[in-house]
Amino acid sequence: MEHEVVSALAAFTQRYVDCWQQEKGHLPASEALYGIPSPCIVENHEDTVYWSPQPFAPAAALDGVERALEISLHPDVHAFYTAQYAGDMAAQFDSLSCQLLQVWSEDDFTRMQENLIGHLLTQKRLKLTPTLFLATTDSEMTMVSLCNISGEIILEEFGTKKRQILAPTLAAFLFGLNPLAV
């Protein structure tokens, strides 16, 4: 049976691609990802890469993060980061604009794990409960994260205990996202 997060992420990604097709007349495009190898690349044109999501292969999990910190990660975060390769996706959740973080390639998956380890080490040092980032916001100090203990999706201020619950689960958060073609 497919994990609920995988289904919710696939549904959001399809809404995102459809939004780009309807508003821009082409696949999602990025200048920031131009020149970076990925199985997602459909076409490079001038300084822009046009991409389409691809299945994550070979099968993987965030085992490196778990081993490095001797911690068990919430199953939702494994599903989220290993379901597909894609570019980051702009979205809105209620009035919150965010960039849903995605894995672009196998190399990017390694980098993402290193960043998650750094994030969790900082939280441990500050004696904060563990969270795993999922999206960036317009502010460099706030991010959308998954609480590793409850599975809730929260808006957190980096390095502080300041947290606001956005959704009870990652699947609920993904189903509540509206794509933005920017």
Curated annotation (Swiss-Prot):
Alphabetic keyword roster: Cell inner membrane, Cell membrane, Membrane
Protein's cellular compartments: Cell inner membrane
Membrane spanning stretches: none
UniProt cross-references to Gene3D superfamilies, sorted A to Z: Syd protein
Cellular component, GO, one term: cytoplasmic side of plasma membrane
Matching CDD domains: Syd
Principal location class: membrane
Top-level lineage group: Bacteria
Pfam families in alphabetical order: Syd
Membrane topology field: Peripheral membrane protein
Described function: Interacts with the SecY protein in vivo. May bind preferentially to an uncomplexed state of SecY, thus functioning either as a chelating agent for excess SecY in the cell or as a regulatory factor that negatively controls the translocase function.
Family that this chain belongs to: Belongs to the Syd family.
Entry protein name: Protein Syd
Origin organism lineage: Bacteria, Pseudomonadati, Pseudomonadota, Gammaproteobacteria, Enterobacterales
Annotated gene: syd
